[in-house]
Amino acid sequence: GNASITRLFVRKLIPTVAPGKDMNDIVSAQFDYSQLDKPDNLNKIRLNSTAVQVENLSDDSVAVSYVDVSTGDAKNVRVKGKRCIMACYSTIVPHLIPELPAKQKAGLSYGEKSPLVYMSVLLRDGGIIEKTGVNQFNCPNSEYDWISTAPMVTMDDYKPEIKAGEPLVLFVTNTPPPKRDLNNPNQTARDLLKAGRHKLYRMSFEDYERPLKKQLNKMFGQYGFDADKDIEAITVNRWPHGYAYHYMELFDPKWGKGQAPHEIGRKPFGNITFANSDSEAFAYVDGAINAAWRSVKEQLLK
C-alpha cells in the first residue's frame, strides 16, 4: 500500500536509512530510524514532534513551535525556516495558524473526514476460505461491508504464498453507519460522518469483535468455520479521521472555479503553503501527490 511509497520517499531523502535502490527491494528493506534526524543530514525527519503553532515572522521567515517527546520528557521547541508547507489535517490548521483570515479558516474547516475501521483477522487455517472459491466478499446491510483475503504485495524479493493448512489473514473494513435523525431534515453528510466518528470512539473492542464473529460464522459456517475456534487473533485499527472529504451533490453547493472551500483554504498565506489530500478534496495518494507538487511550486514561484 501507500506505506511503500512513503518508505521510497524517505530512503530517497535520507539514503543512509536503508539499503536498496528501487521499489523491488523496498518491502524487505530494514530501516534504521536513528538515521532520520542526524545533525549533518541534508534532509531531516523528526518523529514524536507535535506542531502547536506556525507563524509568519517580520523578517520574512516562518517559525514552527512543536512539542518534542523524543527524549521521554516533553519540551517546547521553536525552529525557523524560510518557507513552510503545512501537510496536516486541514481542520486543525486554523488552530495552528490563528492569524489566518476568517474566510480561509472556514474553508479549511468545511470538510469532514470519513471515519473508517480496518481490521486484520488471523485464521488458524485458511483452507476454510479456500473452500468457498472466493477471495473478496461485498456484504451490503451487514456490520462489515467488505471482507477479503488480505491483499498480497509481491515484489522481486518478497513473494508470499497462500498454502492450504496454513494461517491466513482476512482484511475487514467498514464505515461506522450512524442512523439518520428523521426529525432533522437539514442533517448533512458531514453531520453523519461526525456522528459516525463519535460512534467509533464509544465502541469497545468487544463491540467490534462480537458482530464480526457472528457475521463470519454466518458466511463460512457451512464450510465448517467456527469463529471461537478458528480465529487466532483480531487487530482493530480505528481511523477516526480517515479519508478526505469528497463533495456530494446531494448535500453540497456547486461552487465556481477557485471558490470551493478546499480551494479557499489552501491559498498561500505569507511564506506558508498547504498540501495533503484534504487540500484537493480527494482522499487518494495521487491527490496527495498533486497537492505536494502544487504547494512546492507555489513556494518556488514566490
What do these predicted ranges mean?
Residues 1, 5-9, 47-50, 92, ...:
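Alpha-helical packing segments of well-folded alpha/beta enzyme cores
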Residues 18-25, 33-52:
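A conserved beta-strand/loop element that lines the FAD pocket in flavoprotein oxidoreductases
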Residues 1-4, 8-24:
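Low-complexity, highly charged intrinsically disordered N-terminal segments
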Residues 40, 49, 79, 229, ...:
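Structured loop/turn residues at beta-strand edges in well-structured enzyme cores
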Residues 122, 128-302:
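Conserved flavin/dinucleotide-binding core of flavoenzymes
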